[in-house]
């Protein structure tokens, strides 16, 4: 209630269980949130539980969003074709690139499902996808990593400004590579 009152009616509220809840906990929590116009519950169950997500989708009114932990078009197809997801969230950096992520967007579009790419650490990559694919409805913004980029993403009146540089549209700062990088 406090969040809805603070944000007002014009701002969407999304919840994220990060795959940590079981079906009863989702039902209980979402029943408490039903009066606050929650857009979705993200990753309500463990990320590879297709049957559980389908069962939960039949029980709850809140749409399910997921995809950041899925690593192939085939896995997305399982969730989409079985009805276990209503907002599709591919992450190009985890799917192995933009091509596979766009294939997921195509699949979602065929099933009339909106796409909201998972921003993760490289939201710039997802922005480029939004330029070319009609299924992308929303983009996430991760403000706590903007200091890591020479040309961080900019938002103007609630909309991203598209990067003008080639590739991912930015350059990662060396100090962040040293801070967050790891040897492999």
Question: Which residue stretches match the model-derived regions?
Answer:
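Hydrophobic/aromatic residues in well-formed alpha-helices
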Residues: 26, 76, 176-177
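Short acidic catalytic loops
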Residues: 13-16, 86-91, 172
């Amino acid at each position: 209630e406090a969040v809805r009152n603070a944000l007002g009616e014009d701002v969407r509220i999304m919840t994220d269980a990060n795959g940590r809840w079981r079906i009863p906990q989702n039902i209980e929590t979402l029943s408490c949130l039903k009066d606050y116009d929650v857009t979705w519950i993200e990753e309500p169950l463990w990320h590879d539980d297709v049957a559980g997500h389908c069962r939960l989708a039949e029980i709850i009114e809140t749409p399910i969003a997921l995809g950041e932990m899925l690593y192939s078009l085939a896995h997305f197809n399982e969730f989409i074709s079985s009805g276990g997801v209503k907002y599709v969230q591919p992450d190009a950096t985890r799917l192995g690139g933009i091509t596979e992520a766009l294939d997921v967007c195509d699949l979602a579009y065929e099933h009339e499902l909106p796409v909201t790419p998972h921003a993760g650490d490289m939201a710039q990559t997802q922005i480029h996808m939004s330029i070319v694919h009609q299924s992308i409805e929303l983009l996430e913004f991760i403000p706590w990593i903007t200091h890591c980029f020479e040309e961080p993403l900019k938002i103007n009146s609630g909309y991203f400004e598209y990067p003008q540089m080639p590739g991912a549209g930015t350059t990662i700062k060396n100090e962040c590579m040293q801070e967050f990088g790891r040897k492999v």
